[in-house]
């Protein structure tokens, strides 16, 4: 969708009703974002980044480690061809029995029966109206792929946080309902408040700082996923090493869109920017590069994904037209489609002209307390979420 096609909602400066907000849940045209062995056992994050940054040293030989040129700053030992999934990221529901779809059980696992089921009754669980709506929206978002889930779960297997049941992750295959549901679960954690908060905080740091934090964390045995964004699209990958080269740094990654292939994100130290030249494909089949600076690269620590999570939207819509009792309304937009346009043409404006959403191909946020999030799927349709304060 082009910027001049943006949908706009004008609301009062004090209150936005839930019924009005939910009317914005729609499908619009958007672009595709791309086409367990030894390792640390902790899933913590670095508390004092200034302290650990000083400890990062790049002295090992990258060629000897099979990591190209330069010096090794960090290497946790994860390698595509053994620790990645043998199958690529996939879109939508492909199993004949629908076993790879998003389920009520997964939502209960995230938030608990007390939040998801009517009267908190788990067996049998009758989903609340907002739970039913969430399942429908997240099921639609699966049409854009499961990059966040595959990036997270492959690393959890490697770090020993979860057990794959095989000698090496690469031995797993699909269809495999239990594996697919596990991937869906970790994919959906990107939408919970705790994970969104950690990711958003990391995006306030510049690429060089994040790279040094990553190197320190990998050296300490910590687990992270990387999120990258370009023109409103999002993709998630698994970092496993950092090397130092003349121009800056290289982050070595497993991209679940390309199993069995080690890829890299380049960090230009002087410009303080990042570039990933194999994120997607142009219509002619040639690679399409993504790039960015502060605000478009994120690190999400594994410890942010510890359930159960707080469900900030679960009591929305108790009565028709009412606003949420937890302080804000969530507007979700499933977006997917053609190549080359912003990921979502959603723009919300207050009566006094403050905006949040995509304007002119750029994400803007002029509403205090509002949060704009682009889901990471890796293949197309994604879930765009806007949280709006009601007071």
Language-model-detected regions and their locations in the chain:
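Conserved active-site-adjacent core of cysteine acyl-enzyme catalytic domains
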Residues: 153-234, 256
């Amino acid at each position: 969708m082009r910027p001049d096609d943006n949908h706009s909602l004008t609301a009062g400066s004090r209150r936005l009703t839930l019924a009005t907000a939910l009317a914005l849940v729609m499908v619009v045209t958007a672009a595709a974002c791309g086409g367990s062995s030894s390792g640390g056992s902790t899933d913590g994050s670095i508390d004092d980044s200034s302290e650990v940054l000083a400890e990062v040293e790049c002295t090992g030989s990258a060629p000897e480690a099979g990591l190209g040129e330069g010096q090794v700053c960090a290497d946790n030992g994860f390698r595509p061809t053994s620790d990645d999934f043998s199958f690529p990221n996939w879109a939508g529901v492909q199993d004949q029995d629908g076993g790879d779809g998003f389920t009520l059980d997964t939502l209960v696992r995230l938030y608990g029966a007390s939040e998801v089921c009517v009267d908190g009754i788990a067996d049998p669980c009758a989903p609340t109206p907002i739970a039913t709506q969430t399942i429908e929206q997240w099921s639609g978002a699966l049409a854009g792929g499961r990059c966040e889930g595959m990036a997270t779960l492959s690393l959890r297997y490697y770090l020993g946080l979860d057990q794959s049941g095989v000698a090496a992750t690469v031995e797993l295959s699909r269809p495999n309902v239990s594996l697919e549901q596990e991937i869906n679960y970790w994919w959906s954690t990107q939408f919970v408040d705790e994970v969104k908060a950690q990711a958003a905080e990391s995006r306030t740091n510049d690429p060089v700082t994040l790279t040094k934090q990553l190197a320190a964390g990998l050296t300490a045995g910590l687990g992270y996923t990387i999120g990258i964004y370009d023109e409103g699209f999002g993709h998630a990958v698994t970092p496993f090493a950092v090397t130092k080269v003349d121009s800056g740094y290289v982050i070595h990654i497993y991209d679940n869109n390309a199993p069995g292939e080690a890829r890299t994100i380049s960090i230009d130290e002087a410009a303080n920017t990042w570039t990933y030249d194999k994120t997607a494909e142009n219509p002619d089949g040639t690679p399409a590069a993504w790039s960015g600076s502060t605000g478009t690269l994120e690190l999400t620590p594994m410890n942010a994904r510890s359930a159960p999570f707080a469900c900030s939207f679960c009591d929305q819509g108790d009565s028709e037209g009412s606003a949420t009792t937890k302080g804000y309304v969530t507007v979700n937009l499933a977006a997917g489609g053609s190549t080359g346009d912003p990921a979502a043409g959603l723009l919300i404006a207050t009566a006094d002209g403050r905006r949040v959403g995509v304007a002119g191909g750029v994400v803007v946020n002029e509403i205090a307390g509002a949060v704009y999030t682009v889901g990471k799927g890796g293949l197309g349709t994604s879930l765009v979420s806007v949280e709006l304060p009601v007071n």
